Amino acid sequence: MTKRDQNEVLFERAQKTIPGGVNSPVRAFRQVGGTPRFISKAKGPYFWDAENKRYIDLIMSWGPMIAGHANPEVVEAVQKAAETSFSYGAPTEGEIELAERICALVPSIEQVRMVSSGTEATMSALRLARGYTNRDLIIKFEGCYHGHADSLLVKAGSGLLTFADSTQNAPSSGGVPQDLVKHTLVLPYNDVEAIEAVFKKQGNEIAAVILEPIAGNMNLIKPSAEFLKALRDLTSQYGSVLIYDEVMTGFRVALGGAQSLQGIVPDLTCLGKVMGGGMPMAAFGGKKEIMSKLAPLGNVYQAGTLSGNPVAVAAGLKTLEIVSRAGFYECLSAQTEKLMLGLKQGADKSGIPFAVDSVGGMFGFYFADAVPSTYEAVTKTNIDAFKKFFHLMLDEGVYLAPSAYEAGFTSIAHDDAVLQVIIDAAEKSFPQLR
């Protein structure tokens, strides 16, 4: 009797008690097909599945594991913190240290509030912006994903590009009333004329503009300088709050986040992923004038039992210490660029239309002639080619994001030898796409 693949066994078992067999939709392999890999352990740039097959990981928990899986320094910090307790439900000195560190690294953040997920961070930031301005309308952009808060599930990116019909001016998810999203205006990313027109018409009603300063949930899309300048100028002119959702880009693309590369000073910033070192941890912060509206000082309520728990704080503090070391981001950026160059050269040899882009330890590749700059352009890339490439690389032991609409991530553990294995696997795979 042939032994069944243990990933299949676990997936079948999972579907009996977990909806779809996964706890986050993109993990289900719906866009690429096949059986999700169930992970048993990870170390450095690698993880092992239920069959004990080793893969080079190019999602790194969707960004947080910038120092590599099971980094010994982070593990030691977590173990030490766990010896005292997992959670107190009361303030700790560690929370202060982490807040001070974040404020020092991201100058636009004068005060910061810890939460447990990126969704909590963006949801709370929007509530705060509305409370501060006494306005209801918010602007988001097509293909940008800001978590699964109801008012933000309109033409959203990430798994929603796979699972929902996002071409309609309606909620991208069931269970979200049309009435609730009527206060959410959705505009094309990188469209200066659209943002100018909306502010001219409704500027005095707009509480906030929220965006990914480098979009990573419709693959990787960079904003134009003109687009960012228009956003900053118009929000300042009309008294709206500019919110940078740096849950993905914060401490991932640069020590000061995307805003430090772009020269833009947002009013509020949302952080997550890297700042927790892989633990459930996020935050939102910004101008003291705005943050002072939060309870217990102001009338904008936000709370969380596990917010700022000591184990997550310890992981975050140690991770931020590691990424603050001299040369960290220069090395990370160089390695990511080297990987993208290798993939591009491999595709060119096989005559495959293929475009690449990267910033810091974040990258995107597209089966297209050029790097897209809009949501619409991303949806027109060759998704079928991506699906085939994904499985060819998976067979070679390289784990890519299981969706053409997600960015990829490297870590400081992805050294030259690891990169060469990836490039060799790609050079073997590309000819099979012709």
Curated annotation (Swiss-Prot):
One of its GO terms (biological process) is protoporphyrinogen IX biosynthetic process. Disulfide bonds: none annotated. It is found in: Cytoplasm. Its cofactor is pyridoxal 5'-phosphate. Pathway: Porphyrin-containing compound metabolism; protoporphyrin-IX biosynthesis; 5-aminolevulinate from L-glutamyl-tRNA(Glu): step 2/2. Its EC number is 5.4.3.8. It catalyses: (S)-4-amino-5-oxopentanoate = 5-aminolevulinate. Keywords: Cytoplasm, Isomerase, Porphyrin biosynthesis, Pyridoxal phosphate. The modification N6-(pyridoxal phosphate)lysine is found at K273. One of its GO terms (cellular component) is cytoplasm. It is an enzyme of class 5 (isomerase). GO terms for molecular function: glutamate-1-semialdehyde 2,1-aminomutase activity; pyridoxal phosphate binding; transaminase activity. The keyword Methyltransferase does not apply. It holds the Pfam family Aminotran_3. HAMAP family: HemL_aminotrans_3 (MF_00375). Homodimer. Belongs to the class-III pyridoxal-phosphate-dependent aminotransferase family. HemL subfamily. This is Glutamate-1-semialdehyde 2,1-aminomutase. It comes from Polynucleobacter asymbioticus (strain DSM 18221 / CIP 109841 / QLW-P1DMWA-1) (Polynucleobacter necessarius subsp. asymbioticus).
